[in-house]
Amino acid sequence: MNIFHIIKNFFITKRYLYLLPRKIRLKIFNIKKLKLYKTKTGNYYLPQFALKDLIRNEIIDNKIFDKKVYETAVKYVKDDTIVLDVGANFGQLSVLLSMCKKNVEVYSFEASKYIFEILKKNVQINNANVKLFHNLVGNETEQELFIKKLDISKFNTYGSNMIEKTEIRNENSANIEKINSIKIDDIFFGKKISFMKIDVQGYDLEVLKGSKKTILKQQMPIIFEYEE
């Protein structure tokens, strides 16, 4: 084993990756590399080197991340209904709720392109009844937005990163990605919505503003994490 591999393995096993300068982390480590983990809650592709990511680590440890949210949802989700998962992250909750009752369809929304690709793979490998939306849920539909990409080299919890809109309209930038917004009220739902979860790190109010008609019509329970 050469000195390069010795140094690399040291930083991985000791979980000291975050101490390296960002440029070195990006160059030396393939931090976007995914690994398939077979767990008691399903099979999930997760970032292999995101060693400080709480959601990732809970899933790998055969746990349900935010188990109380899942347990609360199960009480309200009914057969033959739709569940809205706004801010689906890696998709564990979407996968589990799609299977908790008969004929449940989950509508999962995720804004980050990188996280969305992981979400899509996890839905597919678990054969879950989930409809995917790569959109920023808010109070407008089809509004073209530019947001800052997640700095995945920091190895923190992806779900704790706030969506940051930017006036820099350059999708070729290494730090910017383009995305279309969507409002819940503009989506056609062919059957009853029995539950809605919102976890979008500071964008919750915009989601609710764009869901007013749906909420008044459906009267579904909603659970969300509000941040000022």
Enumerate the predicted regions with their spans:
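Phosphate/nucleotide-binding beta-alpha loop and adjacent structural elements of enzyme active sites
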Residues: M1-E228
